[in-house]
């Protein structure tokens, strides 16, 4: 009876471990516990309507082409390609997640809110500028 309890306990504990680390071993060893068929299985899924898109290349030419096509007779913001009157008017690329802080001489920075309340990032930048942080 004790052996049966021990065996059932081991099986119960092993299933979450297999679920957690199974894909790790599949990726590291090419399908490890599946007789080496993990790669073939992945290729089969790709053929059934689940197309995987390639990663964006590490090549600035896509950005440069968009920059060259953008028409602006004022100031073209380099990070958002927005056309504004002055550089410090440039919007942040992710305004729902960043606070815009205007610095001296028409410069601005976009700072991640990081879970802080509205205006907290700007307050910390101002404290740092004053040497208090």
From Swiss-Prot:
One of its GO terms (biological process) is ERAD pathway. Keywords: Signal. Residues 1-19 form the signal peptide. The keyword ATP-binding does not apply. Residues 43-53 have a biased composition (Low complexity). Residues 32-60 are annotated as: Disordered. Probable component of the endoplasmic reticulum-associated degradation (ERAD) pathway. Belongs to the LCL2 family. This is Long chronological lifespan protein 2. It comes from Sordaria macrospora (strain ATCC MYA-333 / DSM 997 / K(L3346) / K-hell).
């Amino acid at each position: 009876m004790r052996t049966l309890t021990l065996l059932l306990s081991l099986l119960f504990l092993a299933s979450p471990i297999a679920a957690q680390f199974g894909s790790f071993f599949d990726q590291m060893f090419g399908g490890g516990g599946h007789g080496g068929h993990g790669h073939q299985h992945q290729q089969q899924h790709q053929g059934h309507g689940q197309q995987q898109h390639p990663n964006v290349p590490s090549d600035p030419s896509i950005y440069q082409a968009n920059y060259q096509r953008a028409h602006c007779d004022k100031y073209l913001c380099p990070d958002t390609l927005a056309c504004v009157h002055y550089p410090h008017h440039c919007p942040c690329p992710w305004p729902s997640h960043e606070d815009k802080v205007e610095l001296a001489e028409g410069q601005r920075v976009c700072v991640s809110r990081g879970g802080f309340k509205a205006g907290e990032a700007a307050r910390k930048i101002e404290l740092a500028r004053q040497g208090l942080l």
